[in-house]
Each structure stands twice: as structure tokens, then as C-alpha cells.
Amino acid sequence: MSSDTFPTGALFTGIQCSTMHITDGDNTLLYQASHQHEEYGSGEWLHFTGTGYLIRLNAWRHPVLHLKRLGLSKACRRLVVTLMNHHPITLLHLDAAGDILPGIETFDW
């Protein structure tokens, strides 16, 4: 089956990078948010993977604003904005085994 036969919303693009690009505080907030079980909670777009997080950036019209409301750091939000501005991504996979992206701030926690 050719990829051009799928509806536009069926295809996802993403980037995987190291969790070193987020702070320890961001890690704590993402862990808590990804484990919410209420209907329409953050657990529907922030997913814990065991070694990081999968963030569905297309779940909200302004995902960075939602990350700010959750209390994530400017560095984390800057990472998301930078990646979204340079690449047409719908998913961000932050993973402990992910690559460190050049030119992006890192944290040793």
C-alpha cells in the first residue's frame, strides 16, 4: 500500500532525542502528567515509555502553551518550539537512549 493513499491525518512524523535536553524538574512533571488517568487529562497526549516520553504535539493547537501551563521549563519549551519550527513533526520522543542534538541545551541529572 502506497503512503499517498493514506489520509493526511493518518501519517505521523517525529523526532527522537535524549532526555538530557530536559531538566530533572521537567522529567518529574512529565512523569506525573503522563500518569493521569482522568478523562481528557494530560495522559492522553503525554505518554511515559519506560525510558522517556512520547509527546503528541498534534493533540493541541498550541502544545507549547499546554506545556507551559503544566510548569515545564523554558528550556524544554524552547526545545519543542525549535524542533517544531525546523521540522514538520507531530511527535516528540524524549528517550534516555536518544541522541543528543547539536546546538540544543543539555542537563546532567
Q: What do the PLM-derived regions correspond to, one by one?
A:
Residues H66-L67:
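Surface-exposed cleft-lining segments at the edges of enzyme active sites
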Residues S3, Y40-G43, R77-V81:
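Short secondary-structure capping micro-motifs at structural edges
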Residues L70-W109:
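Short, compact, well-ordered microdomains
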Residues T13, T51-Y53, T90:
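A generic secondary-structure signal marking the coil-to-beta-strand transition
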Residues G9-L11, H47-T49, H86:
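A short, structural micro-pattern
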Residues G25-A59:
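An N-terminal amphipathic alpha-helical segment
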Residues M1-N27, H93-A96, T106-W109:
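Short, extreme N-terminal segment that most often corresponds to the first beta-strand
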